[in-house]
From Swiss-Prot:
It comes from the Eukaryota. Residues 1-68, 115-228 are annotated as: Disordered. Residues 169-187, 212-228 have a biased composition (Basic and acidic residues). GO terms for biological process: cold acclimation; response to abscisic acid; response to water deprivation. Belongs to the plant dehydrin family. This is Dehydrin Rab25. InterPro entries: Dehydrin (IPR000167), Dehydrin_CS (IPR030513).
Length: 228
C-alpha cells in the first residue's frame, strides 16, 4: 500500500510508490512542484530534513532540466545571478561571464540570443532589427513629403507633364466674365502702335482711334454703361 501525503493545494499524492521508491509531486501540468516545508517538532526543537527525492532548481522547480519554455534563466533583479550551462555564473546587469556560443540558454524572446548578445560594458542587450531597415510607414511618409513639395510648386497639365501652378489672383481673373477678351484687346492695343512705328503721324492717329474704339467696346460690355 503506497503512503499518501497532502500537497500544497490539499490534494493527496503518494510519497513512495509500491516498490518503496520516492515519487516527486507534480502539478496539474505535469511539472514537478517545490518541496513542502519540512515538519517541525516544536516541542523538541527538531526539524526533519527535506525529502531527498525532490531537489529544487531555479524558481523553485525540481531538477535542473525543468524550466518552463517561456521562463528565463536570467532573473530580473539587479543582483540576481544565473548559472550558464558551462557552470559559470553570469548576471543580467553585467559583471559576470556570458555563456559560450552554441550553448542553450533560456530567455524571453528578444532578451538573450543563443550566442549571448552583449554591449560594451558586458551587459546583455536585447536583440533588435537592423538599423538600416526602414519600415513601410517611414517610406510612405517620405514619399508623401516629396510629392507634396513638388505639387505645391507645379501641377499636372493634363498631357503627362508638369506646369507652373498659377497663383490665386490669376485664377480669379480667369473666372471673371470678359477677362480674357480684355487681355486680348489690351495686347492688340499695345502691339498696334509698335507695328506702325516710322510710318508717320497718320499711323499714330489710327492707333489712337483703334485704342479709343476698344475702350468704348469695354464700356459697352460693362453693366450700367449701355445706351445713355
Amino acid at each position: 500500500m503506497a503512503e499518501h501525503a497532502t500537497g500544497v493545494y490539499g490534494h493527496p499524492y503518494p510519497r513512495v510508490d509500491q516498490y518503496g521508491n520516492p515519487v516527486p509531486p507534480v502539478d496539474q501540468y505535469g511539472n514537478p512542484v517545490p518541496d513542502e516545508p519540512a515538519p517541525r517538532d516544536t516541542a523538541a526543537g527538531y526539524v526533519a530534513p527535506p525529502d531527498p527525492a525532490v531537489s529544487t532548481g531555479d524558481y523553485g522547480l525540481a531538477g535542473a532540466e525543468a524550466p518552463h519554455p517561456h521562463e528565463s534563466a536570467v532573473m530580473s533583479g539587479a543582483a540576481a545571478a544565473a548559472v550558464a550551462p558551462g557552470g559559470e555564473a553570469y548576471t543580467r546587469d553585467g559583471g559576470g561571464v556570458v555563456p559560450p556560443a552554441g550553448e542553450k540558454t533560456f530567455a524571453y524572446e528578444g532578451t538573450v540570443s543563443a550566442a549571448g548578445v552583449t554591449g560594451a560594458s558586458g551587459q546583455l542587450q536585447p536583440t533588435t532589427r537592423e538599423e538600416g531597415h526602414t519600415t513601410l510607414g517611414e517610406t510612405l511618409r517620405r514619399s508623401g513629403k516629396s510629392s507634396s513639395s513638388s505639387s505645391s510648386s507645379s501641377e499636372d497639365d493634363g498631357q503627362g507633364g508638369r506646369r507652373k501652378k498659377k497663383s490665386i489672383k490669376e485664377k480669379i481673373k480667369e473666372k471673371l466674365p470678359g477677362s480674357h477678351k480684355q487681355e486680348e484687346q489690351k495686347q492688340a492695343g499695345h502691339t498696334a502702335p509698335a507695328a506702325g512705328t516710322g510710318t508717320g503721324t497718320g499711323t499714330h492717329a489710327a492707333g489712337k482711334h483703334e485704342k479709343k474704339g476698344i475702350v468704348e467696346k469695354i464700356k459697352e460690355k460693362l453693366p450700367g454703361h449701355g445706351h445713355h
